[in-house]
């Protein structure tokens, strides 16, 4: 049996972050070979990580990364907010967002991509992090937006570090106009999106099933009225609904006397040409995952915007 020294155990702990007894066992199992012990611990850690996958990961961070006319948004979940404040976790999320810039805009392609500064993939690096920290984590979703001319504006709410927070937004503005002006306008619209959480750009982007559900509610509320009256009520009710949930029709949070569409039209003079809001993406941390009620981040943004 190899002579396992305290210095060897310390070295292995520094390399892996594993516990002292685990490091000692690894060295005994590998006859004191440090690199083999690292692999032994990784295998053991990964086995433990697989067991943790059943636990709900609803905390974590969203991250944005921008390259001017191209930007990415990712959400990585953890089980606790404590881990979200961990430097190693934050570094992983930040790097994942950078890698996402050159991904196909889906989780599978990002997981398979090379993780910078390593000889492994993004997926494997996350598994290593799970083994080291001891908490389940998931790369939940990723999105990218790009324009041939114009800007992709970004905004992060609840920011814990540069580009990392609780709500992340990307806004694509297509225009040949002044980039500095477009960047400012785009950020304002991104803040608006964070606060109001629109379902789509305009009515054409609303799921037909959602429209039918709203129509059914209006018909039920006004049951018994003549058909021609009911039709007008439904039409009017849907128009009001669209103003609430479609980005272009919403009152602009920075100036509620105007809609976002009107703001874009007025911006053309300052931009020096037409400005088209082509797309947006909004991720709110943990949305759709069952968990205990947390802070209403959208309300926080709305309050911040209104001063």
Curated annotation (Swiss-Prot):
Keywords carried by this UniProt record: Cytoplasm, Elongation factor, Protein biosynthesis
One MF annotation (Gene Ontology) recorded for this entry: translation elongation factor activity
Residue span of region Involved in Mg(2+) ion dislocation from EF-Tu: 80-83
Gene Ontology CC: one annotated term: cytoplasm
Coiled-coil residues: none
InterPro entries in alphabetical order: EF-Ts_dimer_sf, Transl_elong_EFTs/EF1B, Transl_elong_EFTs/EF1B_dimer, Transl_elong_Ts_CS, UBA-like_sf
Subcellular location: Cytoplasm
PANTHER family, sorted: ELONGATION FACTOR TS, ELONGATION FACTOR TS, MITOCHONDRIAL
Job of this protein: Associates with the EF-Tu.GDP complex and induces the exchange of GDP to GTP. It remains bound to the aminoacyl-tRNA.EF-Tu.GTP complex up to the GTP hydrolysis stage on the ribosome.
Family: Belongs to the EF-Ts family.
Stated name of the protein: Elongation factor Ts
Gene: tsf
